């Protein structure tokens, strides 16, 4: 399960998800990827489940990069507890994902295999996604534009 080794603050506020992703919104390492089209929280268990689904389908064929990391703790209070008496204990970790963020990248396999592997992974995730290729992000004068 993915989680930070150590954190500055054990509990954080929930925050709100506004706007589009400004970082990690293009394919940097692989040839194919899966890109979020809506915002949401992806837990470390969901990331791991998607990773296993991709690796089982591609077998030993390609290389996979996980481009998101769960660095936000989510707290929960025990069941049947009265209101008050402080914030609950951290139960699990989530990655905050905005629209446009590339979640996984894949290389070393053909497009059909990559498309099916990413489809299987998308079923494990709580956000809507789309399949993207490296050629979708063309570089124009040092700036990467979505084509």
Swiss-Prot record:
A Pfam family per the record: Ribosomal_L16
Keywords recorded for this protein, A-Z: Ribonucleoprotein, Ribosomal protein, RNA-binding, rRNA-binding, tRNA-binding
InterPro entries registered for this protein in UniProt: Ribosomal_uL16, Ribosomal_uL16_bact-type, Ribosomal_uL16_CS, Ribosomal_uL16_dom, Ribosomal_uL16_sf
GO cellular component, one term: cytosolic large ribosomal subunit
GO biological process assignments: translation
GO function terms (MF aspect): rRNA binding; structural constituent of ribosome; tRNA binding
Matches recorded under PANTHER family: 50S/60S RIBOSOMAL PROTEIN L16 (PTHR12220), LARGE RIBOSOMAL SUBUNIT PROTEIN UL16M (PTHR12220:SF13)
HAMAP family named among the record's database cross-references: Ribosomal_uL16
UniProt similarity note: Belongs to the universal ribosomal protein uL16 family.
Subunit relationships: Part of the 50S ribosomal subunit.
Function: Binds 23S rRNA and is also seen to make contacts with the A and possibly P site tRNAs.
Protein name, UniProt field: Large ribosomal subunit protein uL16
Gene this protein is translated from: rplP
């Amino acid at each position: 399960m993915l989680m930070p080794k150590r954190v500055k603050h054990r509990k954080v506020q929930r925050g709100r998800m506004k706007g589009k992703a400004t970082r990690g919104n293009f394919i940097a390492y692989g040839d194919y990827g899966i890109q979020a089209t809506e915002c949401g929280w992806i837990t470390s268990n969901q990331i791991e489940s998607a990773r296993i689904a991709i690796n089982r389908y591609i077998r030993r064929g390609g290389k996979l990069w996980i481009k998101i990391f769960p660095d936000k703790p989510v707290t929960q209070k025990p069941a049947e507890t009265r209101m008050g008496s402080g914030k609950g204990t951290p139960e699990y970790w989530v990655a905050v994902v905005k629209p446009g963020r590339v979640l996984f990248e894949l290389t070393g396999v053909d497009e059909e295999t990559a498309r099916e592997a990413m489809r299987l992974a998308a079923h494990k995730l709580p956000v809507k996604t789309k399949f993207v290729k490296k050629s979708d992000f063309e570089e124009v004068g040092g700036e990467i534009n979505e084509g």
